């Protein structure tokens, strides 16, 4: 859900556009190493060199680099001389020792006019400068001590809604009906989820299929064979609904899923297979049917803030008029908001020695994915990260942030999650959205390459390489439907259970999904598989994107493609930690180049020299792409993941890509 745009960073004086730009042109491009070095975010204590090209024979009287964030500094730019008949100016600045976002623009006096070069108006803070623009270029300055766990950049993640993944043999999960709750238990594993609408328009989400932690444990060999190394569970704690984003008790695994011992056993066996487990933390709200609120009286007459204003949990919530008028999440009365800055709540969730976040990491999990992270106060996030890292420096904190996380605007405030003090990384919805737009011909390759390059510019490498690169999720229609161009959004919600793709739609959707898959497994960050996507599951929006895994009924071609892409990534370290550059050879072909050069990877760690190029062609026609040997670290031979050999002729490669096909090539 989009809820804001980054600020312009125009502290101080605003300058009006002048009319003298036809003869006076300034140029600066943040993605050009000649204009900005180093590229990307900069650690505290670092230096940045910024250059400006003046395309006019008459040099300006004065030329300044203006930098600000709260305070403002103006740096005179010194002339370096002519390059290709154009005057080059330069300023070198220290970024200081404070993690923050810096904003900058260029200004000069010309023929009595004040001339400004600012950022393009796409709110990225990156790209080619625009004369007269009031937008600011962004420079991210992050804590030099900031690091993220290596397993995040190396991993392949798999997201599981436990109720919909697998019924464990030898368990009686279907017998664990909720006390006093009207729930529906599906006997047929392959049925569609039910849509049971309440008066407020919400789905009751009270139908269950009986998937449990034991079922996940029994499928660990399958997940290992798929190439997975990180398991991310949607919430598993006690809750009334099947999705469990309405927590009832943070200290208990929902009995329909198992218990604490079942989770510990799963974590231990997963670890033995080289897999980690991450939990979903829902800390901005609880369920109304919780120990802490108890609106329905499940826990007794005088337990919980709704039942007793003297309850120890009363201060967790904001009552406008007790008991029925209270703040709730996005208007849902079933989800009372908590006051995250309440001292008792902070101690319970974060600070006590056996707090919620500490307890479950000690029990063998490897960290947390935070639901609606952009709705949590920044001090809360900082303390959460500190507490998790105190238990295990190798544990991770991922956040649900839907936009560029370096300058997210939420509730009127600009928040940066990339400075090293809050999150390790976030869900990469911008990548997902950009690739969908490209594959559906809504944006051309150049626009998408620019978007992805801007993200890479704004994010510190530890953050960028730890991104959760998702294709599907529980909050979106199945990716197969999206890429088939038929996600059911144009039909009534009550009819979506019966919605099916046609044979032709399924074929085109599968081809596009395989292109997206290839690209996702070729870029920095953890590629994430939403359970069932690898099996060809289709479905409209919630609850139909939350169907059960089709054991024994998988789309074997799709499954084989997922396995192949995971094996490719796991077998080539350059796809995990190599430097990254996005390319757009033509409007219909998007590419990414990964490199290890001079015996080092993107983090400066020892690595074998390597180069990989991935190209995906969204058009139905064959396209020929030309690459120079210089593009691929001087290589003269490229070998694709399916065994094709490409040889340079005259210092260039000619690569034919069939319609709706892709290729990944490795330098030899």
Residue positions per predicted region:
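Substrate-binding/active-site clefts of carbohydrate-active enzymes
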Residues: 161-230, 236-363, 384-390, 407
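Glycan-association/targeting regions that enable binding to alpha-glucans and other polysaccharides
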Residues: 2-154, 158-159
């Amino acid at each position: 859900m989009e809820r804001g745009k980054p600020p312009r960073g125009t502290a101080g004086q605003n300058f009006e556009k002048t009319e003298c730009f036809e003869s006076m042109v300034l140029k600066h491009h943040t993605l050009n190493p000649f204009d900005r070095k180093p590229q990307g975010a900069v650690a505290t204590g670092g230096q940045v060199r910024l250059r400006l090209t003046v395309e006019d024979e008459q040099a300006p009287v004065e030329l300044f680099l203006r930098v600000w964030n709260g305070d403002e500094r103006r740096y005179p730019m010194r002339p370096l001389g002519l390059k290709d008949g154009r005057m080059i100016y330069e300023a070198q600045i220290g970024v200081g020792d404070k993690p923050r976002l810096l904003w900058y623009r260029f200004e000069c006096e010309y023929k009595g006019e004040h001339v400004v070069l600012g950022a393009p108006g796409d709110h990225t803070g990156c790209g080619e400068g625009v004369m007269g623009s009031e937008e600011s270029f962004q420079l991210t300055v992050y804590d030099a001590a900031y690091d993220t766990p290596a397993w995040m950049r190396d991993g392949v993640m798999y997201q599981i809604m436990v109720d919909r993944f697998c019924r464990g043999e030898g368990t009686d999960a279907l017998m664990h009906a909720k006390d006093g709750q009207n729930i529906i238990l599906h006997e047929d594993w392959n049925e569609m989820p039910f849509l049971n609408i309440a008066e407020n328009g919400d789905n009751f989400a009270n139908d269950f299929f009986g998937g449990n932690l034991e079922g996940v444990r029994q499928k660990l060999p399958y997940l290992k064979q798929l190439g997975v190394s990180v398991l991310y569970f949607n919430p598993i704690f006690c809750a009334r609904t099947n999705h469990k984003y309405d927590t009832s008790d943070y200290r208990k695994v929902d009995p329909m899923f198992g218990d604490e011992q079942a989770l510990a056993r799963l974590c231990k066996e997963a670890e033995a297979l080289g897999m980690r487990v991450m939990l979903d933390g829902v800390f901005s709200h609880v369920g109304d049917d919780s120990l802490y609120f108890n609106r329905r009286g499940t826990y007794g007459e005088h337990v919980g803030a709704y039942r007793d204003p003297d309850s120890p949990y009363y201060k967790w919530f904001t009552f406008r008029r007790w008991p029925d008028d209270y703040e709730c999440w996005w208007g849902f009365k079933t989800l009372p908001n908590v006051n995250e800055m309440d001292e008792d709540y902070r101690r319970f969730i974060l600070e006590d020695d056996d707090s919620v976040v500490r307890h479950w990491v000690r029990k063998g999990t490897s960290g947390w994915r935070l639901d609606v992270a952009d709705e949590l106060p920044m001090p809360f996030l900082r303390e959460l990260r500190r507490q998790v890292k105190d238990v295990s420096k190798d544990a991770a904190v991922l956040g649900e942030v839907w936009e560029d996380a370096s300058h997210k605007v939420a509730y009127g405030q600009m928040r940066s999650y990339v400075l090293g003090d809050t999150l390790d990384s976030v869900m990469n919805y911008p990548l997902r959205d950009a690739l969908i737009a490209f594959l559906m011909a809504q944006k051309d390759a150049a626009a998408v390459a620019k978007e992805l390059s801007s993200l890479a510019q704004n994010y510190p490498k530890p953050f960028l390489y730890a991104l959760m690169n998702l294709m599907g999720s529980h909050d979106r229609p199945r990716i197969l439907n999206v890429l088939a161009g038929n996600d059911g959004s144009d039909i009534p919600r009550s009819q979506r259970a019966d919605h099916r793709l046609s044979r032709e739609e399924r074929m085109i959707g599968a081809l596009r999904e395989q292109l997206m898959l290839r690209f996702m497994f070729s870029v920095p960050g953890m590629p994430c598989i939403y359970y069932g996507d690898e099996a060809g599951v289709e479905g409209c929006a919630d609850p139909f994107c939350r169907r059960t895994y089709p054991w024994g009924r998988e789309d074997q071609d799709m499954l084989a493609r997922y396995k192949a892409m995971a094996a490719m990534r796991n077998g080539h370290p350059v796809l995990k930690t190599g430097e990254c550059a996005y390319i757009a050879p033509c409007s219909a072909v998007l590419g990414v180049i990964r490199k290890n050069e001079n015996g080092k990877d993107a983090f400066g760690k020892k690595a074998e020299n390597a180069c990989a190029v991935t190209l995906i062609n969204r058009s139905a026609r064959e396209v020929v792409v030309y690459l120079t040997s210089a593009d691929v670290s001087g290589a003269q031979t490229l070998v694709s993941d399916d065994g094709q050999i490409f040889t340079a002729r005259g210092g260039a490669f000619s690569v034919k890509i069939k319609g709706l096909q892709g290729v990944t090539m490795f330098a030899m």
